[in-house]
Amino acid sequence: MNKILFLIPAYSFKKLLKHIDLKLLRSYWIGFALSLTTLTSVAQNKVFTGGASYYAKSFEGRKTANGELYSNYDMTCASRTLRFHTFLKVTNLKNKLVTIVRVNDRGPYAKNRIIDLTEQAARIIGSYKHGITKVKLEIVQPPENTDSLEKYFMQEQVIDAEGKVVNPTGYTISIWRTRDFDHALLLTKYLQQEEYIQSFYVGKKYQNGRPLYHILVLNISTQEEAVKLKDFWERKGFMRVRMLEKF
Protein backbone atom coordinates (compact mmCIF):
# COMPACT_ATOMS: atom_id res chain seq x y z
CA MET A 1 0.00 0.00 0.00
CA ASN A 2 1.49 3.33 -1.03
CA LYS A 3 1.52 5.92 1.73
CA ILE A 4 3.24 9.13 2.81
CA LEU A 5 3.37 11.00 6.09
CA PHE A 6 4.70 14.31 7.27
CA LEU A 7 4.87 16.12 10.58
CA ILE A 8 4.50 19.76 11.56
CA PRO A 9 6.18 19.75 15.00
CA ALA A 10 4.25 21.52 17.77
CA TYR A 11 7.40 22.89 19.39
CA SER A 12 8.47 24.54 16.12
CA PHE A 13 5.14 26.32 15.84
CA LYS A 14 5.34 27.57 19.42
CA LYS A 15 8.84 29.00 18.85
CA LEU A 16 7.71 30.75 15.68
CA LEU A 17 4.63 32.22 17.31
CA LYS A 18 6.75 33.79 20.08
CA HIS A 19 8.98 35.71 17.70
CA ILE A 20 7.02 36.43 14.53
CA ASP A 21 4.05 38.74 13.91
CA LEU A 22 1.19 36.41 12.96
CA LYS A 23 -0.19 38.88 10.43
CA LEU A 24 3.08 38.74 8.53
CA LEU A 25 3.85 35.08 9.11
CA ARG A 26 5.02 33.37 5.92
CA SER A 27 7.57 30.73 6.78
CA TYR A 28 8.92 28.19 4.29
CA TRP A 29 10.13 24.89 5.77
CA ILE A 30 13.59 23.97 4.38
CA GLY A 31 12.71 25.80 1.16
CA PHE A 32 10.64 23.04 -0.35
CA ALA A 33 7.16 24.26 -0.24
CA LEU A 34 4.99 24.39 2.85
CA SER A 35 3.90 28.01 3.27
CA LEU A 36 2.58 28.48 6.79
CA THR A 37 0.31 31.51 6.56
CA THR A 38 -1.85 32.35 9.54
CA LEU A 39 -5.46 31.18 9.57
CA THR A 40 -6.87 34.70 9.92
CA SER A 41 -9.02 36.14 7.17
CA VAL A 42 -7.13 37.58 4.20
CA ALA A 43 -9.17 40.78 4.05
CA GLN A 44 -11.65 42.58 6.29
CA ASN A 45 -14.49 42.11 3.80
CA LYS A 46 -13.96 38.36 3.91
CA VAL A 47 -15.39 38.00 7.40
CA PHE A 48 -19.10 37.28 7.76
CA THR A 49 -21.48 36.66 10.66
CA GLY A 50 -24.91 35.07 10.57
CA GLY A 51 -26.89 31.92 11.21
CA ALA A 52 -25.61 28.40 10.56
CA SER A 53 -27.77 25.34 10.07
CA TYR A 54 -26.82 21.80 9.07
CA TYR A 55 -27.93 19.19 6.56
CA ALA A 56 -30.40 16.46 7.46
CA LYS A 57 -29.03 12.91 7.49
CA SER A 58 -31.22 12.09 4.48
CA PHE A 59 -28.93 14.13 2.21
CA GLU A 60 -26.22 11.45 2.48
CA GLY A 61 -25.09 10.40 -1.01
CA ARG A 62 -26.94 13.13 -2.92
CA LYS A 63 -25.12 15.26 -5.47
CA THR A 64 -24.04 18.72 -4.37
CA ALA A 65 -24.10 21.75 -6.66
CA ASN A 66 -20.50 21.17 -7.79
CA GLY A 67 -21.17 17.51 -8.62
CA GLU A 68 -19.64 15.85 -5.56
CA LEU A 69 -21.54 13.34 -3.47
CA TYR A 70 -22.59 14.78 -0.13
CA SER A 71 -21.33 13.03 3.01
CA ASN A 72 -22.38 13.67 6.59
CA TYR A 73 -18.83 12.69 7.60
CA ASP A 74 -17.06 15.28 5.46
CA MET A 75 -16.44 18.92 6.44
CA THR A 76 -18.07 20.79 3.60
CA CYS A 77 -20.74 23.46 3.45
CA ALA A 78 -23.29 25.26 1.31
CA SER A 79 -22.97 28.99 0.55
CA ARG A 80 -25.19 31.12 -1.67
CA THR A 81 -22.38 33.21 -3.17
CA LEU A 82 -18.87 32.02 -2.26
CA ARG A 83 -16.91 30.17 -4.93
CA PHE A 84 -16.65 26.41 -4.84
CA HIS A 85 -13.47 25.19 -3.10
CA THR A 86 -13.38 28.28 -0.86
CA PHE A 87 -12.14 27.34 2.62
CA LEU A 88 -13.85 28.87 5.65
CA LYS A 89 -12.86 29.01 9.28
CA VAL A 90 -16.18 28.64 11.12
CA THR A 91 -16.41 29.87 14.72
CA ASN A 92 -19.42 29.24 16.93
CA LEU A 93 -19.82 32.65 18.58
CA LYS A 94 -21.42 31.16 21.68
CA ASN A 95 -18.77 28.62 22.66
CA LYS A 96 -15.83 29.71 20.40
CA LEU A 97 -15.39 26.22 18.94
CA VAL A 98 -13.86 26.21 15.45
CA THR A 99 -13.51 24.05 12.37
CA ILE A 100 -12.41 24.43 8.73
CA VAL A 101 -14.91 23.66 5.96
CA ARG A 102 -14.89 23.74 2.15
CA VAL A 103 -17.68 25.15 -0.06
CA ASN A 104 -19.13 22.54 -2.43
CA ASP A 105 -22.86 23.33 -2.50
CA ARG A 106 -25.38 26.17 -2.82
CA GLY A 107 -27.74 27.42 -0.12
CA PRO A 108 -29.17 27.96 2.43
CA TYR A 109 -31.89 30.25 1.08
CA ALA A 110 -33.59 31.25 4.33
CA LYS A 111 -32.92 34.90 5.23
CA ASN A 112 -31.63 34.16 8.72
CA ARG A 113 -28.90 31.71 7.59
CA ILE A 114 -25.61 32.17 5.74
CA ILE A 115 -24.22 28.61 5.76
CA ASP A 116 -25.31 24.98 5.87
CA LEU A 117 -22.81 22.62 7.51
CA THR A 118 -22.37 18.88 7.37
CA GLU A 119 -23.26 16.93 10.50
CA GLN A 120 -19.53 16.36 11.12
CA ALA A 121 -18.74 20.09 11.05
CA ALA A 122 -21.79 20.94 13.18
CA ARG A 123 -20.75 18.42 15.83
CA ILE A 124 -17.23 19.85 16.03
CA ILE A 125 -18.44 23.40 16.68
CA GLY A 126 -21.14 22.20 19.08
CA SER A 127 -24.13 23.31 16.99
CA TYR A 128 -25.58 19.87 16.18
CA LYS A 129 -29.16 19.55 17.49
CA HIS A 130 -29.10 23.20 18.61
CA GLY A 131 -31.04 24.71 15.72
CA ILE A 132 -29.77 27.90 14.09
CA THR A 133 -26.39 28.90 15.57
CA LYS A 134 -24.73 32.30 15.18
CA VAL A 135 -21.30 31.89 13.62
CA LYS A 136 -18.41 33.90 12.23
CA LEU A 137 -17.01 32.86 8.85
CA GLU A 138 -13.50 33.79 7.74
CA ILE A 139 -12.08 32.94 4.34
CA VAL A 140 -8.69 31.25 4.75
CA GLN A 141 -6.10 30.40 2.14
CA PRO A 142 -4.48 26.97 1.81
CA PRO A 143 -0.66 26.78 1.97
CA GLU A 144 1.06 27.82 -1.25
CA ASN A 145 2.85 25.36 -3.54
CA THR A 146 0.88 22.35 -2.29
CA ASP A 147 1.34 20.62 -5.66
CA SER A 148 5.12 20.76 -5.19
CA LEU A 149 4.77 19.60 -1.60
CA GLU A 150 2.66 16.60 -2.54
CA LYS A 151 5.11 15.55 -5.26
CA TYR A 152 8.02 15.95 -2.82
CA PHE A 153 6.45 13.67 -0.25
CA MET A 154 5.65 11.05 -2.86
CA GLN A 155 9.42 10.48 -3.09
CA GLU A 156 9.56 8.96 0.41
CA GLN A 157 7.28 6.54 2.18
CA VAL A 158 7.33 8.39 5.50
CA ILE A 159 8.72 11.89 5.99
CA ASP A 160 8.41 14.89 8.31
CA ALA A 161 8.26 18.59 7.50
CA GLU A 162 12.01 18.98 8.00
CA GLY A 163 12.74 16.47 5.26
CA LYS A 164 13.73 13.62 7.59
CA VAL A 165 12.50 10.08 7.14
CA VAL A 166 10.08 9.07 9.89
CA ASN A 167 9.60 5.49 11.09
CA PRO A 168 6.34 5.46 13.05
CA THR A 169 5.99 2.95 15.87
CA GLY A 170 3.18 1.92 18.16
CA TYR A 171 -0.49 2.69 17.69
CA THR A 172 -1.96 5.33 15.38
CA ILE A 173 -5.15 7.39 15.62
CA SER A 174 -6.77 8.55 12.37
CA ILE A 175 -8.84 11.59 13.36
CA TRP A 176 -10.38 12.45 9.99
CA ARG A 177 -9.81 11.80 6.30
CA THR A 178 -10.51 13.66 3.06
CA ARG A 179 -9.82 13.49 -0.67
CA ASP A 180 -8.71 17.14 -0.60
CA PHE A 181 -4.99 17.68 0.13
CA ASP A 182 -5.41 21.42 0.82
CA HIS A 183 -8.17 20.73 3.32
CA ALA A 184 -6.03 18.20 5.17
CA LEU A 185 -3.17 20.71 5.40
CA LEU A 186 -5.40 23.53 6.65
CA LEU A 187 -7.06 21.46 9.36
CA THR A 188 -3.71 19.99 10.44
CA LYS A 189 -2.29 23.50 10.75
CA TYR A 190 -5.25 24.65 12.83
CA LEU A 191 -4.99 21.67 15.17
CA GLN A 192 -1.25 22.23 15.53
CA GLN A 193 -1.86 25.84 16.58
CA GLU A 194 -4.10 24.69 19.41
CA GLU A 195 -2.81 23.71 22.84
CA TYR A 196 -2.82 19.98 22.14
CA ILE A 197 0.23 18.03 23.23
CA GLN A 198 0.06 15.69 20.23
CA SER A 199 1.94 16.27 17.00
CA PHE A 200 -0.19 15.89 13.90
CA TYR A 201 0.75 14.14 10.68
CA VAL A 202 -0.94 13.92 7.31
CA GLY A 203 -0.86 10.42 5.90
CA LYS A 204 -1.71 9.40 2.36
CA LYS A 205 -3.21 6.12 1.22
CA TYR A 206 -4.82 5.07 -2.02
CA GLN A 207 -8.44 3.92 -1.95
CA ASN A 208 -10.01 2.68 -5.19
CA GLY A 209 -7.07 4.18 -7.06
CA ARG A 210 -7.55 7.67 -5.59
CA PRO A 211 -5.56 9.36 -2.80
CA LEU A 212 -7.16 9.71 0.62
CA TYR A 213 -5.49 11.97 3.19
CA HIS A 214 -5.68 11.13 6.91
CA ILE A 215 -4.97 13.47 9.83
CA LEU A 216 -3.03 11.30 12.26
CA VAL A 217 -1.56 11.08 15.74
CA LEU A 218 1.33 8.59 15.67
CA ASN A 219 3.71 6.72 17.98
CA ILE A 220 1.20 5.94 20.74
CA SER A 221 2.93 3.50 23.04
CA THR A 222 0.05 1.48 24.52
CA GLN A 223 -3.38 0.31 23.46
CA GLU A 224 -4.86 1.87 26.60
CA GLU A 225 -3.47 5.28 25.66
CA ALA A 226 -4.72 4.87 22.09
CA VAL A 227 -8.23 4.05 23.32
CA LYS A 228 -8.22 7.18 25.50
CA LEU A 229 -7.09 9.35 22.57
CA LYS A 230 -9.75 7.85 20.32
CA ASP A 231 -12.38 8.69 22.92
CA PHE A 232 -10.94 12.22 23.29
CA TRP A 233 -11.32 12.99 19.58
CA GLU A 234 -14.77 11.43 19.39
CA ARG A 235 -15.87 13.73 22.21
CA LYS A 236 -14.47 16.60 20.14
CA GLY A 237 -17.10 15.74 17.53
CA PHE A 238 -15.11 13.67 15.02
CA MET A 239 -17.40 10.89 13.81
CA ARG A 240 -15.02 8.38 12.21
CA VAL A 241 -12.00 8.24 14.51
CA ARG A 242 -10.06 5.01 13.98
CA MET A 243 -7.44 3.29 16.11
CA LEU A 244 -4.84 1.42 14.07
CA GLU A 245 -1.96 -0.80 15.12
CA LYS A 246 -0.08 0.60 12.14
CA PHE A 247 -0.95 3.11 9.44
Question: Where are the predicted features?
Answer:
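Bacterial N-terminal signal peptides that target proteins for export
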Residues: 4-29
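Secreted/periplasmic proteins
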Residues: 42-172, 177-186, 190, 231, ...
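Extracytoplasmic
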Residues: 179-247
